[in-house]
Amino acid sequence: MRFLDGHTPAYDLTYNDVFVVPGRSDVASRFDVDLSTVDGSGTTIPVVVANMTAVAGRRMAETVARRGGIVVLPQDLPITAVSETVDFVKSRDLVVDTPVTLSPEDSVSDANALLHKRAHGAAVVVFEGRPIGLVTEANCAGVDRFARVRDIALSDFVTAPVGTDPREVFDLLEHAPIDVAVMTAPDGTLAGVLTRTGAIRAGIYTPAVDAKGRLRIAAAVGINGDVGAKAQALAEAGADLLVIDTAHGHQAKMLDAIKAVASLDLGLPLVAGNVVSAEGTRDLIEAGASIVKVGVGPGAMCTTRMMTGVGRPQFSAVVECAAAARQLGGHVWADGGVRHPRDVALALAAGASNVMIGSWFAGTYESPGDLLFDRDDRPYKESYGMASKRAVAARTAGDSSFDRARKGLFEEGISTSRMSLDPARGGVEDLLDHITSGVRSTCTYVGAANLPELHEKVVLGVQSAAGFAEGHPLPAGW
């Protein structure tokens, strides 16, 4: 990575401050770009879903891992919940999706409550384990909410044995009334569903899998209490990667926590953060972390910078921390501050091996929250920061009322925010398409066949706010 002559920055930069200069390229197609990472996380696209309660759940974990990313489960989850989620994700198919299911006796109201849990647009009606119908929003429109789904389900739908080539499923759906193929096991029971778009994605993305060929998932742990014991429990639960997480990672308790977990020799990549300086990066790697999480205050739900004045513009933080990590054989994840595909590309160009995304994914079908509608009937989901009063209240539920009240006074995050669900990109896979398409194009403009080459070859410039605004498309004439 280098800056254009005369563009060497005299101050720290955000993603908005920077642009990529196109260079000579021998990369013929975006599909020739390898987006897999080399940091040991096992991701085949450089996307990590942040350990936020409003974002990271089992539906998100399954879907993102199937497309090559990885989800970090929040540190507030009990070990039993982590174990159940890990077992669920690792039992999922690498190609077909887990469907929303209903029984024939369920009501239309039940169907409406569940249809938005997945992006498929349909629920499968199951009797004695076998699919007997499909229900969509259109079926439910104008129907009494107490009606039974057996009376409105569509019995004419496409089925195929699980293991059918995705291209064949795509062809089967070409003239189907509903864009959902119901995949069945050899005994005729329901195995999953696959849409036409899902069939296409199966040929583009490579799932992030463990040594046994199962989908990957990560889990977070804090720096308080018996960190080693919890890390051991998370590893035994089946987590593929551990994240030691706190807002201020460059502190003695973090270094002690890293050493405690590293000494267990669990055989898992160890991520720690957050920091924004070379010194902090070096200290965490020397303590035993293999990956350092970079970012203080850039996240959409974070108020740290406005509350404390502490933090650093994210692009410059990633550049400095990535350089320090490379000197020690480590890696960094850019955590927070990405709002467009260009930001992800710039974080990777700066030297990050993966980019953590939180709030951007909160407004999707796969995030854990319920889908809500505003007074204009526009869909949204609620998001909140992990240092907010809402998150702190959940984290301290077992404390005394006095301690809970005292801790509640010290929040650094938004407790409720509406994240709109984009009708054009309602599923997290739609956003992954959006992001990876942008990153692939960036690589072709730079002449990079993979992510290490992107960092090596990229030439950057510094732009004004007007320069950044110029790059925005105009929704109407001027």
From Swiss-Prot:
Catalytic activities: IMP + NH4(+) + NADP(+) = GMP + NADPH + 2 H(+)
GO cellular component annotations of the record: cytosol
Molecular function GO terms recorded: GMP reductase activity; IMP dehydrogenase activity
InterPro entries: Aldolase_TIM (IPR013785), CBS_dom (IPR000644), CBS_dom_sf (IPR046342), GMP_reductase (IPR050139), GUAB1 (IPR005991), IMP_DH (IPR005990), IMP_DH_GMPRt (IPR001093)
Modulation of this protein's activity: Activity is allosterically regulated by the ATP/GTP ratio in a pH-dependent manner. At pH 7.8, GTP has only a minor positive effect and ATP only a minor negative effect on the activity, however, at lower pH values, the effects of ATP and GTP increase. ATP-dependent inhibition can be restored by increasing GTP concentration. IMP and XMP are competitive inhibitors.
EC number annotated for this UniProt entry: 1.7.1.7
Protein keywords: Allosteric enzyme, CBS domain, NADP, Oxidoreductase, Purine salvage, Repeat
Domain CBS residue range list: 95-152, 153-211
CC cofactor: a monovalent cation
Annotated residues for binding of NADP(+): 245-247, 295-297
Family listed: Belongs to the IMPDH/GMPR family. GuaB1 subfamily.
Protein name, per record: GMP reductase
Organism: Mycolicibacterium smegmatis (strain ATCC 700084 / mc(2)155)
